């Protein structure tokens, strides 16, 4: 990856940043995609008020163990590529921090790693994910409240379910693998875990949900949001969009007295 020119948040093109882990000329580079997707997610009201986060593993790059992570406490719609943290799996070695950038870029803010980092790492190590998305979607929060006495969210017989992967444990390797796509008659089950005062304290509950629900590609956090992962960033994006559609529909069905599953499930 080549040295690149990146924009300061305040003044465009004021600094050239010599950084081998960034590449301004590649629109599909993880650092650039994170910024693009964060703006898209902001427009969908999924990452407002600095909430939420996203990380991408460079699965198609020279080192597929590199993970790019958006920082904490930053307005996601204004995020710039040079603001990324980079860690290397499996040891989670920190290779890059935006705090090492020139003072003209960092003098007004001390960057912190995303509080979602240990949860993102859980998705990479337990599911070999290529990207992990965390949003504060109101649809996710509402479903967690409407299913307040449940530890699972369920919905079936909805066409949009077909956008989600059908997952199964490979008996030989013990790993969860995609074996196809869910079908109209399939029942989607998402685990719901309880929120905690601090994001990182969700890690154990998330890991337990990932372990106990090999068929899921997402976990709902009650009164908080959702974590979604996929084999690459584009799959994770599709899964997140499909799930948000289903969660919004489920809220409307619940409020209208329509069951989200059928008696034949």
Curated annotation (Swiss-Prot):
Out of the domains of life, which is the source? Eukaryota
Entry binding sites for Zn(2+): 134, 136, 224
Q: Name one GO cellular component term.
A: cytoplasm
- Annotated binding of substrate, by residue: 116
Per the record, the major location class is cytoplasm
- Molecular function via GO: methylthioribulose 1-phosphate dehydratase activity; zinc ion binding
- Biochemical pathway: Amino-acid biosynthesis; L-methionine biosynthesis via salvage pathway; L-methionine from S-methyl-5-thio-alpha-D-ribose 1-phosphate: step 2/6
Cite the active-site annotation.
Answer: 159
Enzyme Commission code: 4.2.1.109
Q: Which reactions appear under catalytic activity for this entry?
A: 5-(methylsulfanyl)-D-ribulose 1-phosphate = 5-methylsulfanyl-2,3-dioxopentyl phosphate + H2O
Membership in a protein family: Belongs to the aldolase class II family. MtnB subfamily.
Task performed by this protein: Catalyzes the dehydration of methylthioribulose-1-phosphate (MTRu-1-P) into 2,3-diketo-5-methylthiopentyl-1-phosphate (DK-MTP-1-P).
Q: What is this protein called?
A: Methylthioribulose-1-phosphate dehydratase
Query: Which organism is this protein's natural source?
Result: Debaryomyces hansenii (strain ATCC 36239 / CBS 767 / BCRC 21394 / JCM 1990 / NBRC 0083 / IGC 2968)
User: What lineage does UniProt assign to this protein's organism?
Assistant: Eukaryota, Fungi, Dikarya, Ascomycota, Saccharomycotina
Q: What gene makes this protein?
A: MDE1
